């Protein structure tokens, strides 16, 4: 089957204005992930497909989350303390709610959500994961372009 589920998709520009970098997270066994790699490689404008789950387990990956919480004045300091433990911060304050912003690994985000769950979570927005290998070799299409002075 050609169908597969995309758990997370993040797209952003690179230093090269003609190239964007995509991070796609797909759950599945080796057969499913092989199908994902093959389907992506067939796309005309794809420069390179890197599978961090196979090629390079030594990666740094992060996710962004925003949590809107309905609070009364007594709860503000409790939520601020929880945010501080996770090195998150209060991104917005209104008379009846707070928005907590955090970045981190999937495990850190899950742990933060579990501590915020007892509060009145109004809305949760999660950004897709981004990942980068720790090696010194950059992904060719995403590497910064060398600029030459114009004479």
Regions found by a protein language model. Give the residues of each.
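Long, contiguous binding/interaction regions
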Residues: 1-21, 25-151
């Amino acid at each position: 089957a050609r169908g597969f589920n995309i758990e997370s998709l993040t797209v952003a520009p690179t230093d090269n204005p003609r190239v964007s970098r995509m991070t796609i997270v797909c759950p599945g066994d080796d057969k499913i992930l092989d199908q994902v790699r093959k389907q992506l490689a067939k796309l005309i404008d794809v420069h390179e497909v890197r599978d961090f789950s196979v090629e390079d387990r030594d990666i740094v990956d992060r996710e962004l989350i925003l949590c809107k919480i309905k609070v009364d004045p007594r709860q503000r300091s409790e939520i601020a303390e929880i945010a501080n433990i996770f090195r998150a911060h209060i991104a917005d304050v209104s008379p009846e709610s707070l928005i907590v912003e955090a970045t981190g690994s999937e495990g850190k985000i899950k742990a933060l959500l579990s501590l915020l769950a007892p509060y009145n979570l109004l809305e949760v927005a999660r950004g897709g994961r981004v990942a980068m290998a720790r090696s010194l070799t950059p992904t060719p299409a995403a590497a910064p372009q060398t600029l030459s002075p114009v004479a």
